[in-house]
């Protein structure tokens, strides 16, 4: 319902009519029959009773997964037939609800591209990997990924309601033989129990919301019994593939385990249905904050205007756009990949052009296991020791004067600085800024630069390159500052230049340094600074 239709409906209802109905709320919108709005159904399910259609177990049991199933509802292309006929294809399963959203006659339908295999899935591409994020490298026990200091990813199932063709975990997802047994799930919990730095657990898979309610609750209860686990998150596409699953019983169970957060996965505005709006409304009313993680996909959402429509519709149903991921280098996803520049173009078209709440972070999940790297357009043009030069989304260029009397934060007197949460082995750049170390060496750096020298070298003394007052590498204690030969404690010289007493200017009163003849005037070129 657009703004014109809402205005007309309000006028028709009359000013004195009660009770008030919020026609802007997507979860309360009505269809032509005056009943809650619903999405279309494919013709083969037109006569299915509503009580069956709205039963999530029925939706799971009636999923389409073969060429013969899908040609009942879609006019398949030769490319799709090739993909569906491949013996080693990634699993196919599509709920009746989700396949009904597809235009049966449009081979480029954006929902269709996400769930129907094509022949190009079978082609390898440069950089392709089975586990492009190296999750299994960061896995202390099967199904648990500990990549970041204070949080873990807990995979509790390999099953989903439907299967995305670009799935980053296609190496295990959809394969019932890869499911995690009770012993492995207990090992995941035991690792979390003995690792007190873990304060945040993300439940994923597969999709945890496909589990039987008792199994899901057992996992949640196990986590809530661990005192140092502060928040639990769930990553799920069930509200999108099968919104019927989000019923009162599930929401009542989830809210027992607060604080609880949930991220859904919507890629295109065509997925924004009345059913999804009502599912998200139920979750929000259960006190669960909602976010959205989407993937940038060629032929689906690689368009600024599609993305702007999507994020605006998401915030309307109280779902905050969280991440938009660059497509991973996984098997079967080559035809979905876009240049990173396309993602930057999309963020450029969102930031400033729509609400800040509607702008997600653009993320490249580093191949090889480097983790999530946020990428964004550059709004910092230049800087000096006293100001920065910035530009906004319109190209407006401005400067921000840095303060001249800033008193740095007193780390020695700060209880938080003196008692930080432990991040063993993962301080990274923060460790450099905190002064805990002065550089980061890549693996093999020392061996490479030894240049094969195996004998004692009279000039080589490792103590020469250990900085005073700083631990050069993580875990090293900083050496105390020495007393220099001048008798003064080591430290800054105050900025005095050689040949100039106490930093006095080398120029006379009123004089300025002049550029050499024929050279451009640097002051003119940097007048903003």
Tell what function each PLM region has.
Residues 1-146, 481-485, 492, 500, ...:
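Flexible, acidic/Gly-rich N-terminal and inter-domain linker regions that tether
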Residues 347-460:
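C-terminal accessory regions of radical SAM enzymes
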Residues 166-168, 214-215, 246, 375-376:
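Short acidic, glycine/serine/threonine-rich loops at helix termini
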Residues 186-200, 206-354:
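Conserved AdoMet/S-adenosylmethionine-binding subsite of the radical SAM
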Residues 139-142, 152-155, 186-193:
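Short, charged beta->alpha transition segments
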Residues 6-10, 281-285, 376:
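Long, compositionally biased intrinsically disordered regions
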Residues 2-3, 420-495, 499-529:
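C-terminal non-catalytic accessory extensions
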Residues 146-183, 234, 526-527:
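Canonical Radical SAM [4Fe-4S] cluster-binding loop centered on the CxxxCxxC motif
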């Amino acid at each position: 319902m657009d703004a014109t239709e809402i205005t007309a409906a309000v006028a028709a209802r009359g000013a004195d009519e009660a009770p008030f109905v919020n026609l802007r709320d997507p979860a309360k919108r009505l269809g032509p029959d005056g009943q809650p709005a619903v999405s279309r159904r494919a013709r083969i399910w037109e006569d299915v009773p509503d009580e069956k259609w709205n039963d999530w177990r029925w939706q799971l049991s009636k999923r389409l997964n073969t060429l013969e199933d899908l040609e009942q509802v879609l006019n398949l292309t030769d490319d799709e037939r090739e993909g569906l006929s491949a013996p080693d294809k990634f699993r196919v399963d599509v709920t009746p609800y989700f396949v009904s959203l597809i235009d049966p006659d449009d081979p480029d339908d954006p929902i269709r591209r996400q769930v129907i295999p094509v022949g190009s899935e079978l082609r390898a591409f440069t950089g392709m990997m089975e586990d492009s994020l190296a999750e299994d490298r960061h896995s202390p026990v099967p199904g648990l990924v500990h990549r970041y200091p204070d949080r873990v990813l807990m995979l509790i199932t390999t099953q989903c309601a439907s299967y995305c063709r670009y799935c980053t975990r296609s190496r295990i997802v959809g394969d019932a033989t890869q499911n995690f047994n009770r012993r492995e799930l207990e090992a995941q919990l035991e690792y979390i129990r003995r690792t007190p730095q873990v304060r945040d657990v993300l439940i994923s898979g597969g999709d945890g919301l496909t589990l039987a309610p008792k199994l899901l609750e057992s996992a949640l209860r196990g986590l809530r019994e661990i005192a140092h686990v502060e928040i639990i998150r769930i990553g799920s596409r069930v509200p999108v593939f099968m919104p019927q699953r989000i019923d009162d019983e599930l929401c009542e169970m989830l809210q027992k385990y607060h604080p609880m957060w949930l991220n859904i996965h919507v890629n295109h505005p065509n997925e924004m249905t009345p059913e999804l709006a009502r599912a998200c409304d139920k979750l929000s009313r259960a006190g669960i904050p909602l976010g959205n993680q989407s993937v940038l996909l060629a032929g689906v959402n690689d368009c600024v205007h599609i993305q702007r429509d999507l994020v605006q519709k998401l915030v309307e149903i109280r779902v905050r756009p969280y991440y938009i991921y660059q497509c991973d280098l996984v098997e079967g996803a080559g035809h979905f990949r876009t240049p990173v520049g396309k993602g930057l173009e999309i963020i450029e078209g969102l930031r400033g052009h729509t609400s800040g709440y509607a702008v997600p972070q653009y993320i490249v999940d580093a191949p090889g296991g480097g983790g999530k790297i946020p990428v964004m357009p550059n709004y910092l043009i230049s800087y000096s020791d006293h100001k920065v030069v910035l530009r906004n989304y319109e190209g407006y260029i401005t400067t921000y004067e840095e303060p001249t009397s800033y008193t740095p934060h007193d780390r020695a007197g700060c209880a938080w600085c003196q008692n930080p949460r432990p991040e063993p082995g993962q301080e990274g750049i923060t460790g450099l800024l905190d002064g805990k170390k002065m550089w980061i060496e890549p693996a093999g750096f020392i061996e490479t630069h030894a240049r094969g020298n195996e004998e004692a070298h009279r000039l080589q003394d490792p103590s020469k390159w250990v900085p005073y007052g700083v631990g050069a590498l993580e875990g090293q204690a900083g050496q105390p500052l020495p007393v220099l030969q001048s008798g003064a404690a080591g430290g800054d010289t105050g900025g005095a230049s050689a040949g100039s007493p106490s930093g006095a200017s080398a120029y006379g009163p009123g004089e300025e340094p002049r550029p050499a003849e024929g050279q451009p005037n640097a002051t003119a070129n940097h007048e903003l600074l």
